[in-house]
């Protein structure tokens, strides 16, 4: 493994991306070009030599990190983020790909399936997504196809579908999974087909309160719906730290600040209550409102058993910052759902979320390097967004 993504790989991605709008806009690729043209020589070989010779203190590690963040700044400009106001360009799905899916789905259902329209859904990062209008035995049916991207974020179809079906069986409002292809034999990656849920993203007062209530309702479900291991809450916390640490080690050379962060979390992080089912990406954008169906929660690839504070800290202190400041979120959580933590608990669980983000975002770099569909967002996430989370982690664990 190398510390930097090879320049030739990046330049090939730029050339391909300029011919395929599904891989990124021209503005994004211009930012990527600025990054690769101006980043200079990789400082990490010299840093690795220093790490082999002596223990490098946190202050020096953070100085290195600040240099890396400055170098990667153009890539932050290429990242589309979770901004729900962004309008993504309408991109048609490759007819050959969607035809293969329709043929496969028809075989699975034992029905005649044909494609009326298929378009790329923008805004998601863990999956390629299509919005597809089908005729199933002559009946119009609208579905979403979620396709893996080489292990992006360390998530997979089997676990996501298991979580969705388990939660649906427990009465929680999730999209119905119609069919699963877990071999990669149709599209080269596993995927599943689910119902297209009607609804819109809401950021008004009532909409935000409904999101909070939905997360609270999720936490009220028995953890055994997803995990019947009977582990203690303490064990779950330590297992989750080790899970994310193990993931980053599969995708990048050793990071002294991530290792330090993991050790800090093992020493300081404590459960705030019994283990619950955690969404892992809760907040505006992953909740759709419909007048008839009410609220449906989507994007379950991160669902797992953990501490409720993981969801609340992510919502209030990270994902929800575009909507309200952290203090406003904390006050609303207390009023709507009775969620209250000490300042130290908020700090600890914010650190865990930054740790998780620093680890998981490195998978995007692997996906970008491996190809063949290299997007501007993959590189931005695997480099610049990773460094942002790592900086925020170090602000807490190296303080």
Q: Predicted regions: what is each one?
A:
Residues 1, 119-134, 139-140, 144-145, ...:
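Active-site acidic catalytic loop and adjacent metal/ATP-binding pocket
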Residues 2-34:
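Short terminal alpha-helical segments
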Residues 6-9, 16, 34-41, 309-341, ...:
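Active-site activation/catalytic loop segments of kinase-like enzymes and analogous catalytic loops
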Residues 14, 42-77, 86-91, 328, ...:
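ATP/Mg2+ or Mg2+-diphosphate-binding catalytic cores
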Residues 19-26, 40-44, 55-61, 252-255:
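Charged, low-complexity interaction regions
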Residues 96-112, 220-280:
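An alpha-helical support segment within catalytic cores of ATP-dependent transferases
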Residues 112-119:
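Conserved N-terminal boundary motif of the eukaryotic protein kinase catalytic domain
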Residues 119-242, 246-257:
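ATP-binding pocket architecture of kinase catalytic cores
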């Amino acid at each position: 493994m190398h510390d930097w993504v090879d320049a030739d790989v990046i330049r090939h991605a730029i050339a391909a991306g300029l011919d395929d709008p599904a891989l990124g806009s021209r503005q994004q690729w211009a930012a990527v070009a600025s990054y690769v043209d101006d980043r200079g020589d990789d400082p990490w070989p010299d840093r690795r030599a220093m790490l082999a010779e002596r223990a490098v203190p946190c202050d020096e590690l953070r100085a290195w990190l600040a240099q890396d963040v400055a170098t990667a700044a153009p890539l932050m400009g290429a990242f589309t983020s979770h901004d729900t106001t962004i309008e993504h360009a309408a991109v048609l799905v490759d007819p050959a790909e969607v035809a293969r899916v329709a043929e496969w789905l028809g075989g699975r259902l034992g029905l005649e399936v044909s494609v009326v329209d298929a378009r790329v859904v923008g805004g998601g990062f863990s999956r390629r997504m299509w919005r597809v209008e089908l005729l199933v035995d002559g009946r119009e049916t609208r579905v979403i196809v979620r396709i893996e991207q080489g292990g992006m974020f360390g998530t997979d179809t089997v676990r996501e579908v298991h979580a969705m079906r388990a939660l649906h069986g427990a009465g929680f409002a999730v999209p119905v999974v119609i069919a699963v292809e877990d071999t990669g034999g149709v599209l080269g990656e596993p995927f599943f087909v689910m119902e297209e849920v009607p609804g819109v993203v809401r950021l008004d007062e009532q909409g935000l309160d409904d999101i909070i209530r939905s997360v609270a309702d999720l936490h009220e479900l028995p953890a055994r719906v997803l995990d019947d291991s009977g582990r203690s809450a303490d064990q779950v916390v330590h297992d989750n730290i080790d899970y994310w640490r193990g993931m980053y080690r599969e995708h990048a050379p050793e990071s002294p600040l991530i290792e330090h962060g993991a050790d800090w979390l093992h020493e300081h992080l404590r459960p705030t209550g019994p283990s619950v089912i955690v969404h892992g990406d809760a907040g505006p954008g992953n909740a759709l409102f419909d007048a008839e169906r009410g609220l449906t929660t989507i994007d379950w690839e991160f669902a797992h058993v953990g501490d409720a504070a993981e969801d609340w800290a992510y919502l209030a202190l990270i994902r929800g910052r575009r909507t309200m400041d952290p203090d406003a979120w904390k006050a609303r959580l207390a009023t709507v759902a009775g969620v209250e933590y000490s300042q130290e608990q908020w700090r600890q669980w914010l650190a865990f979320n930054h740790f998780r983000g620093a680890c998981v975002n490195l998978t995007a770099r692997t996906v970008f390097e491996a190809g063949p569909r290299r997007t501007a967002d993959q590189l931005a996430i695997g480099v610049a967004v990773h460094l942002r989370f790592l900086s925020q982690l170090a602000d807490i664990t190296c303080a």
